[in-house]
């Protein structure tokens, strides 16, 4: 989906998506890439389009394969998907070592991850530990993220970033180099 009101009111192509460019992009993408599954074509094409055209919030694509080798008298087989950007809010925390460095590196890594765009980052604030109180204070913050990832994929990415920061999960509410939590994901 694209916001058509502003370009429609202004009659200004710069405020819209140039559908000619989009069609040529799709043609070139299909000519340059080979996939075994229709699903793979659609997943990769949708991500490429959404990454390239920021004005496109959501896209529905369908690929049809005529004369698919299924052994039945069908003219065509098709697969359709809808993919789009999601908004997530992530909490960041650290209470070991170079706390601010861990947090800034996590923000950078998220922003550089495929299908992720960090839109806003809060200030970092020092807070007292909860639960296990005999440990160093935490440095905490939050960020707003636009992502193409599902909640499960995003959680997996957060765990990978924590692992790179040598996060060890031994004690609930215990000390950690980096703690990343999904606070909100769209309206879930």
What are these model-derived regions, one by one?
Residues 31, 36, 57, 67-68, ...:
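Core catalytic alpha/beta fold that binds nucleotide/phospho-ligands
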Residues 1-88:
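N-terminal, polar/charged subdomain of small-to-medium soluble alpha/beta proteins
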């Amino acid at each position: 989906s694209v916001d058509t009101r502003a370009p429609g009111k202004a009659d200004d192509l710069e405020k819209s998506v140039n559908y000619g460019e989009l069609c040529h992009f799709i043609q070139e993408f299909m000519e340059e890439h080979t996939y075994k599954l229709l699903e793979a074509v659609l997943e990769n094409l949708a991500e490429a389009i959404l990454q390239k055209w920021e004005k496109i919030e959501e896209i529905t694509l369908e690929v049809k394969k005529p004369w698919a080798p299924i052994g039945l008298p069908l003219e065509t087989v098709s697969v359709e998907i809808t993919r789009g950007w999601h908004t997530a809010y992530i909490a960041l925390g650290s209470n070991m070592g170079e706390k601010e460095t861990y947090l800034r590196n996590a923000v950078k890594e998220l922003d550089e991850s495929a299908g992720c765009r960090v839109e806003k980052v809060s200030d970092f604030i020092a807070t007292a530990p909860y639960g296990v109180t005999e440990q160093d204070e935490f440095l905490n913050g939050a960020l707003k993220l636009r992502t193409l990832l599902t909640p499960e994929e995003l959680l997996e990415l957060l765990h990978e970033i924590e692992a790179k920061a040598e996060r060890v999960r031994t004690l609930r509410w215990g000390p950690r180099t980096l703690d990343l939590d999904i606070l909100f994901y769209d309206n879930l």
